[in-house]
Amino acid sequence: MTGDAGALVLFSGGQDSATCLAWALDRFETVETVGFDYGQRHRVELECRDDFRARIVELNPAWAARLGPDHKLDLSVLGQVSETALTRDAEIALRADGLPNTFVPGRNLLFFTLAAALASRRELRHLVGGMCETDYSGYPDCRDDTLKSLQVTLNLGIGSRSVVHTPLMWLDKAQTWGLAKILGGEKLVDLIRTGTHTCYRGDHDRLQDWGYGCGTCPACELRMKGWQEHRSSLDE
């Protein structure tokens, strides 16, 4: 366990950040969470956050002792400066530059900047996010180089010694499910399966084998593929 100060987890209510929350609870003495309301089309993920926080502490008494307050920040300004399929009712497609139109420019940069400011006030040294390069859509602000550079910038600009952790950076979705199993067994896997939301279209009515979602958007396809590979690996 890491003992120097605590951690602030960027917790959206999705699979990746939920796994990162468990990862942080397993390592730090104090863990707080922060979520961002930026007018996302799949805002149902925000509605999953409180219930997930309440249920994850039931899995481990030590985690219950470590989980601290939750913070939710209004970032509706993101919807004013960008027009994407995550903030507009638009069909998901590739842009002319090859990026999907679900990319919200600057989103993670803004998330981490505000999280670092909040963490400084809360005296939390460690920032934890669920970004990864392995199963991703080419988002520039999910890259390892971007986040390492951002850590330097945040420390220079805020005068802190924050550490940015991205425990999923080199994991694919199957390995992310596997990490959840290592951290909390099948109970945590099932909690993430049923208690988080990933679908870009905000479909939280249909419970699939791998969780809620439409099953056809890029986020659902990645989650479904990872789930199938994870379960297949258990049968080998």
Swiss-Prot record:
Family under the similarity heading: Belongs to the QueC family.
Biological processes annotated in GO: queuosine biosynthetic process
Cofactor-binding details, from the entry: Binds 1 zinc ion per subunit.
NCBIfam families per record: 7-cyano-7-deazaguanine synthase QueC (TIGR00364)
Cofactor: Zn(2+)
Listed name of the protein: 7-cyano-7-deazaguanine synthase 2
Reaction(s) catalysed (UniProt annotation): 7-carboxy-7-deazaguanine + NH4(+) + ATP = 7-cyano-7-deazaguanine + ADP + phosphate + H2O + H(+)
Keyword hit for Ligase: yes
InterPro entries in the cross-refs: QueC, Rossmann-like_a/b/a_fold
Pfam families membership: QueC
EC number: 6.3.4.20
Biochemical pathway: Purine metabolism; 7-cyano-7-deazaguanine biosynthesis
Keywords linked to the UniProt accession: ATP-binding, Ligase, Metal-binding, Nucleotide-binding, Queuosine biosynthesis, Zinc
Binding site residues for ATP: F11, S12, G13, G14, Q15, D16, S17, A18, T19, C20, L21
Annotated source species: Sphingopyxis alaskensis (strain DSM 13593 / LMG 18877 / RB2256)
Ligand binding (Zn(2+)): C199, C214, C217, C220
Entry function: Catalyzes the ATP-dependent conversion of 7-carboxy-7-deazaguanine (CDG) to 7-cyano-7-deazaguanine (preQ(0)).
KW Nucleotide-binding (keyword) present: yes
